[in-house]
Curated annotation (Swiss-Prot):
Biological processes per GO annotation: protoporphyrinogen IX biosynthetic process
Catalytic reaction equation(s): (S)-4-amino-5-oxopentanoate = 5-aminolevulinate
Organism: Leptothrix cholodnii (strain ATCC 51168 / LMG 8142 / SP-6)
Gene from which this protein is expressed: hemL
NCBIfam families the UniProt entry points to: hemL, PRK00062.1
Name of the protein in question: Glutamate-1-semialdehyde 2,1-aminomutase
GO CC annotation terms, alphabetical: cytoplasm
EC number: 5.4.3.8
Amino acid sequence: MATPVSSNAELFERAQRSIPGGVNSPVRAFRAVGGTPRFIARAQGAYMWDAEGKQYIDYIGSWGPMILGHGHPAVLAAVQKAATEGFSFGAPTEREVELAETILALVPSCEQIRLVSSGTEAAMSAIRLARGATGRSKLIKFEGCYHGHADALLVKAGSGLATFGNPTSAGVPPEVVQHTLVLTYNDIEQLEEAFKIHGPELACVMIEPIAGNMNFVRATVPFMKRIRELCTQHGALLVFDEVMCGFRVALGSAQSLYAQAIPGFAPDVSVFGKVIGGGMPLAAFGASRKIMSLLAPLGPVYQAGTLSGNPVATACGLATLREISQPGFFEALGARTRRLVDGLSAAAADAGVPFVGDCQGGMFGFFFPRNRGEGLPQNYATVMATDQARFNSFFHGLLDRGVYLAPALYEAGFVSAAHSDADIDATVAAARAALQP
């Protein structure tokens, strides 16, 4: 007799009895869009299947890591081989050295790199390193940029320019974030005023160059150029959080795109995750040899981790980076992502629905402006001003038709090398149906 299949609703009800909110990361609960979360049973290529057996074209990609799609043969083989050799040793391995060398070869701004297990850990460590390197305490971050859930970074903007942040989570004492100043993304005037007031006290400026937790918002070239100039002028470090966009938007990550537009541009510290682990828990932060030499065991800035450089995770990451380093990989991925965004835009135009979208490499985002003719949002406030209700309706319209987008207006989407033109066309067809009155 066949085992009865649990429905998504049954599994969610069961999960809520043992897991807070029924999920292990809040966005998965569908609170932003309403409805019942899908419990995924398996995935392959560009597709996922839920507990009820329904198939979806996947544009979440585990929130970015699955740039090759699910179950890529080369990655799977590397992971299986590594697993037979041992899950974890608590000692150095050749493979972690090889992964570090591979990342450094692709990111010229970094001369050394330290592997950790999560993006939160990497961002937290990068801030500690910047403070240790400068002997200063204060930092700038930007509203709408997410850098993990370390206490000092869980901050929303204050009511005025020079107002330091208030915690956005219970359990974070106000004194922990008293050194964190939150500014408006892409606002040069506000940035200059902040440096004028606090320049000598600033350890660093931390930024997502393409903000994936505002959906998809780019830092403008003039804004990034001014950040670099002010950091250099005042002795603060520029920290690039590329956990999401690193090795997603270009082989050299987002910083390579700004280096093309701004002569001599480079961040001082870089944070990576997601793609470098290929779906396994792995992240990293890197900088010049001089800055990285401040880390223990060489220097006074302490950082450690039991599972850092895990041999199975590094095998997964290495195999992934080798595949995306193949000639033409990002050109093909970018063309497919552009095909999707252009198709969605055409579908919305035909339905008379205001729509704007953008993409880079295998990362994309879109918004439903409230007024026709509005351009792409430039900061968190303009993202907030877009039509949340329209997005929620669109999300469910696609979900019902077998297309799985991120269940929140504020999250980016991801295309993988496994997505075919047929998958893109099927998605656009579903969008046309969902946008009908």
